[in-house]
Curated annotation (Swiss-Prot):
Purpose: Increases neural cell metabolic activity and mitochondrial oxygen consumption rate.
Lineage, uppermost ranks: Eukaryota, Metazoa, Chordata, Craniata, Vertebrata
Organism: Homo sapiens (Human)
Residue numbers spanned by region Disordered: 27-58
Claim: DNA damage is one of the keywords in the record: no
Annotated localization: Mitochondrion; Nucleus
Superkingdom of the organism of origin: Eukaryota
Tissue specificity of this protein: Detected in cerebrospinal fluid (at protein level).
Protein name (Swiss-Prot/TrEMBL): Protein SHMOOSE
Subunit structure comment from the entry: Interacts with IMMT/mitofilin.
Further remark: Shows elevated expression in Alzheimer disease patient brains and protects against cell death in vitro in neuronal cells stressed with oligomerized amyloid-beta protein 42. Intracerebroventricular administration to the rat brain for 24 hours results in significant alterations to the hypothalamus transcriptome and, to a lesser extent, the hippocampus transcriptome.
GO cellular component, one term: nucleus
Length: 58
């Protein structure tokens, strides 16, 4: 495996901000998950359609 690809993969796993890459199990699986995407799904904004949400993937 080329070293640049290894670095990219290790950075993906360290960053933990790519739940689509890591798999669907990261989406709000447990309330104490420490990534922003899980936080967004576990603490939805009641005014979501009318106000911007800090974790909305846009």
């Amino acid at each position: 495996m080329p070293p640049c690809l290894t670095t990219w993969l290790s950075q993906l796993l360290k960053d933990n901000s790519y739940p689509l890459v890591l798999g669907p199990k990261n989406f709000g699986a447990t309330p104490n998950k420490s990534n922003n995407h899980a936080h967004y799904y576990n603490h939805p904004n009641p005014d979501f359609p009318n106000s911007p949400h800090p974790y909305h993937p846009r």
